[in-house]
Amino acid sequence: MTRIAINGFGRIGRNVLRALLERDSDLEVVAVNDLTEPAALARLLAFDSTAGRLGRPVTVDGDTLVVDGRRITVLAERTPGQLPWKELGVDIVLEATGRFTSAEAARAHLDAGAKRVLVSAPADGADVTLAYGVNTDAYVPAEHTIVSNASCTTNALAPLAAVLDELAGIEHGFMTTVHAYTQEQNLQDGPHRDPRRARAAGVNIVPTTTGAAKAIGLVLPNLDGKLSGDSIRVPVPVGSIVELNTTVARDVTREEVLEAYRTAAQGPLAGVLEYSEDPLVSSDITGNPASSIFDSALTRVDGRHIKVVAWYDNEWGFSHRVIDTLELLAAN
């Protein structure tokens, strides 16, 4: 078993643990570090407003979470370099606080005794950025100890872009994600560094920024600098959709585009890219573990101009890619 510690037991940290409980994996979560009381963490794991009840017993024994019989040490340390990873025999740290998102900051986990760090966000200076299934081969175990999993949106965009680029060569493009609100927004109007995100998340459509278009160049170097984009946050708790508008190098037909995505979803990107002909809405894809759920009916083609669209569960799908990447690191 590979011993995993989760630093930050928020939306992604808890969803990763939930997903691990459903998978046959050699990963063992032995510790979580969060500044919240263990009893509160136990409740948040057991009862979830979007994922539902866990359906497995969760109790607290002092500073230990007991989840379906598995004992997980709970820590409350603000400084990653002070965490007892060496004493706990931790192999890999999942850095999921959203705070320590640079290689320099994440390196503190290595100093504390971990062998590798996976950052569940874009990370400046990371040894490699992976969108599992799309650029998995970029991982070089001997060289990469601090790995970024990019973001949920990058993981949804990457299969879309990769298939289209291979089919016809993307020259340039724009992406827009219509994204569920997140904890980083305000519940009610209040101060925020982004004046739009300052407004109440549950009652507004909120235009804002996304780093996904920039990050795609780290995953697919051939597309570096070719895409730009924006995000629109909307009043749903989970379930997002990304639209990619591109100009490609040659004329293509709509059927060529659809066939390329069908083939990829059944072959090299199986489990990461899903092909759908159903008239989906956001609630239909919650709980779907794919990174990217291609909505074939929304495909538009006009010669060299192409629009493709994919849904994604921005929590559950991304959490499964985190686990896939942890398993990749553990095996190498």
Model-derived segments and spans:
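Short, solvent-exposed beta-strand edge segments and adjacent coil->beta transition regions
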Residues: 1, 143-144, 200-202, 239-243, ...
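N-terminal Rossmann-like NAD(P) cofactor-binding subdomain of oxidoreductases
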Residues: 1-198, 322-328, 332
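Generic structural signal for well-ordered, non-membrane alpha-helical segments
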Residues: 9, 13, 102, 150-153, ...
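Generic secondary-structure signature for well-ordered alpha-helical cores
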Residues: 21-25, 162-170, 180-183, 210, ...
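Generic structural signal for residues in well-ordered beta-strands
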Residues: 72-74, 227, 308
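C-terminal active-site/capping subdomain that shapes the small-molecule cofactor and substrate pocket
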Residues: 229, 241, 245-332
